[in-house]
């Protein structure tokens, strides 16, 4: 796909509500589009942590809209915006590195849960034979495919777009798309767990566990470090309120503990530590924005009563 020019200023973003009224559907996920907006901005920096050259195309395709956050925002809004920009850039780079580490270890099957407008299939240097599955709602994938179809270069792996609602039964859809549960898989749950209830998050991770062969890997974010008062504050700031209203919190307990009880060996690292290592520190006055969790399904180990499907 040809590298589109990034729109300068990047102050416009059409909301999910506007697109939904026009299309008679939910439209493009607001969080997915906001993430693309931030990734496009990061990609313009001389010290960028990654180059998401497709993100500007997604933002441009969204059409005219009010600014997500005005570029000259100051005060608390500006501080929150700075924190979120840094956090999402660091999160993206961290999970880039985790997926590539899995590939280097020999994993050739990758699943991006709630993939949104993720472009890793196109921008990461995947080894030959890599099969990547993007799972998300039909309306989001339809928008994404429309933008991708306008380009000239294909993905750098075998890419499968799987339309499914992760709060419902989705395993059949990914199996029908060619997913092989007997093979080790690198799973990524980026920007999804916190928007699920505890019950929904546990059900999703249970399904992931059931579909994971020994040697599989899982990466996700756990937002237990995000202060509740910060979420409540965001509810009262118009550009951020709709995102805060989507917040459900995810698992009730710590993710590594849950994973350990279900046949995974996991660890977590706080995002501020990662940010410091990447020389993109999150503003000191902000609390820890969240934790990044990585886990591996030990070879020869399965949770009691589990078996590979397919």
Swiss-Prot record:
Keywords: Methyltransferase, S-adenosyl-L-methionine, Transferase
Positions that bind S-adenosyl-L-methionine: 136, 165-166
UniProt GO molecular function: methyltransferase activity
Disordered: annotated span: 1-28
Domain of life according to the entry: Bacteria
Composition bias type Basic and acidic residues, residue spans: 9-24
Alphabetized Pfam families for the sequence: LCM
Keyword Metal-binding: no
SUPFAM superfamilies hit by this protein: S-adenosyl-L-methionine-dependent methyltransferases
Gene Ontology BP annotations: methylation
Enzyme Commission number(s) from the entry: 2.1.1.-
Family: Belongs to the UPF0677 family.
The protein's role, per its UniProt record: Exhibits S-adenosyl-L-methionine-dependent methyltransferase activity.
PANTHER family documented for this protein: S-ADENOSYL-L-METHIONINE-DEPENDENT METHYLTRANSFERASE YKTD-RELATED (PTHR43619), S-ADENOSYL-L-METHIONINE-DEPENDENT METHYLTRANSFERASES SUPERFAMILY PROTEIN (PTHR43619:SF2)
Name of the featured protein: Putative S-adenosyl-L-methionine-dependent methyltransferase Franean1_4929
Species per Swiss-Prot/TrEMBL record: Parafrankia sp. (strain EAN1pec)
């Amino acid at each position: 796909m040809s590298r589109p020019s990034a729109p300068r200023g990047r102050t416009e973003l059409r909301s999910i509500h506007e697109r939904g009224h026009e299309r008679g559907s939910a439209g493009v996920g607001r969080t997915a589009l906001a993430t693309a907006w931030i990734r496009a901005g990061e990609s313009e920096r001389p010290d960028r942590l990654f180059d998401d050259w497709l993100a500007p195309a997604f933002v441009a395709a969204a059409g005219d809209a009010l600014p997500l956050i005005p570029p000259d925002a100051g005060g608390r809004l500006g501080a929150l915006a700075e924190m979120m920009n840094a956090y999402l850039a660091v999160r993206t780079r961290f999970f880039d590195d985790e997926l590539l580490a899995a590939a280097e270890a020999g994993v050739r099957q990758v699943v991006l849960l709630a993939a949104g407008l993720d472009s890793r299939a196109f921008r990461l240097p995947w080894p030959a034979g890599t099969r990547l599955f993007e799972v998300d709602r039909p309306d989001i994938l339809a928008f994404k495919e429309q933008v991708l179809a306008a380009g000239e270069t294909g993905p750098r792996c075998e890419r499968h777009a799987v339309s499914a609602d992760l709060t419902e039964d989705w395993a059949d859809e990914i199996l029908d798309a060619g997913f092989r549960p007997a093979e080790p898989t690198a799973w990524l749950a980026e920007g999804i767990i916190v928007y699920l209830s505890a019950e929904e998050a546990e059900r999703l991770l249970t399904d992931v566990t059931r579909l994971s062969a020994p040697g599989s890997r899982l990466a996700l974010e756990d937002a237990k470090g995000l202060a509740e008062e910060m979420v409540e504050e965001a509810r009262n700031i118009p550009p951020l309120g709709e995102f805060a209203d989507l917040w459900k919190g995810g698992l009730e307990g710590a993710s590594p503990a849950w994973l350990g009880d279900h046949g995974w060996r996991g660890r977590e690292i706080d995002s501020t530590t990662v940010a410091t290592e990447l020389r993109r520190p999150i503003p000191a006055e902000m609390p820890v924005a969240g934790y990044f969790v990585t886990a591996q399904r030990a070879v020869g180990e399965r949770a009691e009563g589990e078996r590979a499907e397919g």
